Amino acid sequence: MTKRNKKNNKLYKNIKAIKLSIASNDTILNWSEGEVTKAETINYKSLKPEPGGLFDEAIFGPVKDYECACGKFKKIKYRGVRCDRCGVWVTESIVRRERMGHIALVSPVAHIWMSKELPSPSKISLVLNISYKEVEQVLYFVNYIVLDTGKIKDPKIMPFKFKEVLDLAGKGSLTTRQKMRRVIGYIFRNLIKNRSSEDYRKGKIFYESLKNSSLPFSLNDAFNYIKKYTGFRVGIGAEAILELLNKIDLNYEFSKLNDALRKAKKDSVEDAKVKKILRQLETISWFRNSKLHPKNMILHTVPVIPPDIRPIIQLDGAKFTTSDINNFYRRVIIRNDRLRRILEDGTVPAIVVNNEKRLLQESVDALFDNSSRHKPALSKDKRSLKSLTDRLKGKQGLFRHNLLGKRVDYSGRSVIVVGPELKMYEVGIPALMILKLFKPFIIHGLINKFDSNGNEIRPIASSIRQAEDMIKNQDDLIWGIVYDVIKDRPVLLNRAPTLHRLGIQAFEPRIVDGKAIRLHPLVTTAFNADFDGDQMAVHVPLSENAVNEARAILLASKHILGLKDGRPIVTPTQDMVLGNYYLTTERKGQTGEGIIFGTVHEARAAYEAGKVHLHAIVGISTKAFPNKHFEAQGTLITTVGKIIFNDVLGDNIPYINEGEFDEHACPQKFIVPPSGDVRAAIAAHQVLPAFGKKVISKLIDLLYTVVEFKDLPRILENIKALGFKYSTHSSTTVSVFDIPKYSNKQQYFDEADQQVLKYKQFYNKGLLTDDERYKRVVKLWNGVKEKVSSEIQDLIKREEYRDNSIVVMADSGARGNISNFTQLFGMRGLMSKSFNYERNNQSKIIKDTIEVPIKHSFLEGLTINEYFNSSYGARKGMTDTAMKTAKSGYMTRKLVDATHELIINHDDCGTRKGIVVEAIVETKTRSLVESLFDRIVNRYTIGPILDPETKAEIVPANSLITQELAKQICATSIKQVLVRSVIYCERENGVCQYCFGVDLSTGKLVELGTAVGVIAAQSIGEPGTQLTMRTFHTGGVSTENNLAQGFERLKQIFEVVAPKDYERCVISEVKGVVKSITTTQNAQEVLIESSVDERTYSIPFSAQLRVKVGDAVELGSKITEGSIDIRQLLRVAGIQRVRQYMIVEIQKVYRIQGIEIADKYVEIIIRQLTSLLQVTDAGSSNLFVGQLVHSHHLNELNKSLLLSGKMPVIAINQVFGIDEAASKSNSFLSAASFQDTKKILTDAAVKTQVDYLLGLKENVIIGGKIPAGTGFLTDEELAYLGAKTVQEEY
């Protein structure tokens, strides 16, 4: 890296903020190194840039380092010299990425971002108060605009108004001609005294011509004629708009619009007229506050971006390819030159001049934003050319493709296979890959002349070339260096899609044979990987800090707990579960039953000698386990397998003898006292179930709380090793003959067939509609399948199938479930078929199931028809999964964009506000969705929590509710608890530790610098793919099942979409009591009486009532079943109710599907969706009505206003969907890289917005350190953490 680049790099690292503004013409000239005057690029013979052209070396810098164009000055010694022959500065060629030029325009043009901004009006139309369409007509030389109404003020004579656009080509052309005729008539009749003069005759001709539209005449001449006598002036094109912008007085316009707003319907911000005034007011205030003049929206010079950003590339066979931007610049230069010559000529008719000016305007538009034009400029192959705007926006644009997602050097990818021999923090990387990835480090080691102590040694290779050859030939001498290199360098592994942060983890590399990466089996769950051909990418952290960070934070052995629920994510699966299940199985009558051992070693020796079976029930002295907890001392009744299992669990863990184990000590019921009869106890011992997946998961939960963190990976490793070893010992096989026999189903089929026939007859007679018949048939066959399934479940629990391989696999949780068994030897059942869920379906019945079931099982084999239906269902499943993955990924991206700036940046914000939490119960079925314990654990209190009976303090104020304390609270009659929440955290640019509480991935108080916003978004987005895509409909009657569920419901809440008519429920707008429910001819009338007034709600018969006479109703309570419209709830019951409703509804969606997500993550999202308010009364502030303002900013502002004795601002809460929340970010870089790039950058430029780089995305974009994680640590602290991790490795 050169000195200059080092200096620049330092400069970028010290960027504290970025300001965006509209560049004035003077600014563009300051940027420029010279004017581009020719449309040429490079010479076709010499391939050198043409002087004065788009690649001119005199303007943009030399093509070769320290060499001018003509070759007079070469080499670094002439640095800073300007060649007197060719005018090129002698410097590095990299300046061709920085230096800009300019094109001086003959006629001004409007910037397309300022003149065209759909769907909202453009900035020019808002500032001038002219419609968007009229601005376009003036700019593109269709219609004229009035610049000056002249001396005559009488509207009867001079009917034209200032800034009126004269329609001379459209429907209003006749009216405009009439007005012109009236003015011209007045001139030649009243103002010209000499009736024989040329002007009188001219006026008469114009007067007649305007009467008959078919007669040709020059509009320009007619306007000049009017101007001569009245001073009335019109203009066309960007020059006319520029003149109007120059005349504008921003302060006058601002006060005028404020007055207009006061006179308009101030209370209704939704009113179209008010909306328009608010938009104008916003734009005018932006210009006022930023001290920018609106005239800068019109360009006199066009900047030419550096040539290396729009290169010409030579291909094979003397062909060239070029960036589309060069084509646009060529077009601008050619048209500009042509217009210059026309204007210099002076004899060309005005219509031709105007046409050339329009072409110039269009060419500049195409350069800036080709895709938003009516007819975009096309290449030879009819492809739309990519303009500057197109290079910024979208997935392939600058923001997302180049700044936020870069291709990474020192990386590779390969197929993964299992590596059970590895430790948890290790990964096996093929030797070929290691040599390629670590090549520079290996070469350094080979040519190094000093050892680690600084003593001089003889290098293995004498030069870099020799070292490279040694690596290429895999010389035996290199391996010592290779091992030394990889010992100091962890690698990062990533599996796409990276749905949560555990998709990237660090490992210590180990060299393996072959070409596949070997992955530790315990980390597969976190990566969501399996070994059926998945590929993973490897990345090498290069700098010392990156290596320390990988070790201190990213190492796989540190990621034991999942993020979304704090449960272990490294639970053993499949073979490991099967092995431990086999190991902990108990059987009566096995070899060696009744033997009593004194030590663990004795038991192991007896087993290995074949004297005792693994499953034999034996006794062992409790003294054999000096560090384990027992309720009493004596002889423990257990099995050899369980002795071996408990031996690897380490100390301080109670002896685990049954699935429902005690967390403190092994219970007394398994211990025979010293005076007792051990053999009698063994004979009387009831056989206990073996340890399946759930037991092991519960055990890991316990291990996490009891064992020191550094010892946990070793114990997990031991459990894994036991699992693999004993699943091999179990000799489990799978055969078609293992499948149990089941033969009761035929009688159910016969009964169901009879019933289906009956339904068909009812339908034919008109007693049932087709929808009702379909519904009943589907319900009937589902019932049959449930019967078959339940009988099979009973069948496989029989003693005869106890050791059946397939049953053992399912029972242990290793593989398979009851649904698989039902299909294997019961029936396949109903299959789904494709259906467009989103269409407006009149019958409200979704027919997405084939109503003919597959009666055969896989064991019997399917018929041709059944096979066809089965494959139809399977393909639909695959398609749905692909659709769901894409939709879920997009939602995660939106969530991250809305929340990424939320980082833990303080210990305690000192808030006195919190949320009241209670158990979430499904009101209709009274089933528990989320318990009070789950909602309060790991959070901080606001005030003390007292026992209602004894008044004793359970938890003090501002203290953490631990699991023990949460259990104590739930043991009392307390139903509601006030806890701290991120929603009410008073930190402006982040969240404090106490409001967030415990970090679920560590079980400790969340650390400063944790990016909780991103973690919340990932925790909610990652399980998104598991949510169902179906929208359940069960007929015209609206029930809970009739609503959007799963992913669709989640989308409805996060995007604040109003439910469909048949889904929406009626809510009470008053607090009171249901006085009466009466039935009329068309509806049910519900009368609610409050202390102030009474309301009657008309409920259609298709809706299901939730209230009865005498019921008390609150504001926003549901009167009918269905989903609440969130915006209506906000209007009726306020923001707190909305927040509570959203939390409950999101939790319902996930918990019904069996997915647990902590409340705090949902609250983070809701904080971002509900943190903005809309001003209804600006008080004494500089804000204006309708302006959106952040709640923190408003609180600070009102505090200062009240302390100064001024009127505070009054504002109402708003709820936005995640799309809008991300776009309304305080950072324009973050918002622009999300969506609507053009609009966000335009707005930011007009208000001269400053981005203080507080979030994560902004810092990634500028290439700085993110203000999270180790961004909060010093290099020394990071180095210490890295070194400590190495010491803890086992």
Swiss-Prot record:
The UniProt subunit note reads as follows: The RNAP catalytic core consists of 2 alpha, 1 beta, 1 beta' and 1 omega subunit. When a sigma factor is associated with the core the holoenzyme is formed, which can initiate transcription.
Q: Origin organism of this chain?
A: Mycoplasma pneumoniae (strain ATCC 29342 / M129 / Subtype 1) (Mycoplasmoides pneumoniae)
Q: What would be the name of the gene that encodes this protein? A: rpoC
Q: List UniProt keywords, sorted A-Z.
A: DNA-directed RNA polymerase, Magnesium, Metal-binding, Nucleotidyltransferase, Transcription, Transferase, Zinc
Q: What is this protein called?
A: DNA-directed RNA polymerase subunit beta'
One matching Pfam family is RNA_pol_Rpb1_1
Task: Give me the comment on cofactor binding.
Answer: Binds 1 Mg(2+) ion per subunit.
- List the transmembrane segments: none
Which NCBIfam families does the record cross-reference, listed alphabetically?
A: rpoC_TIGR
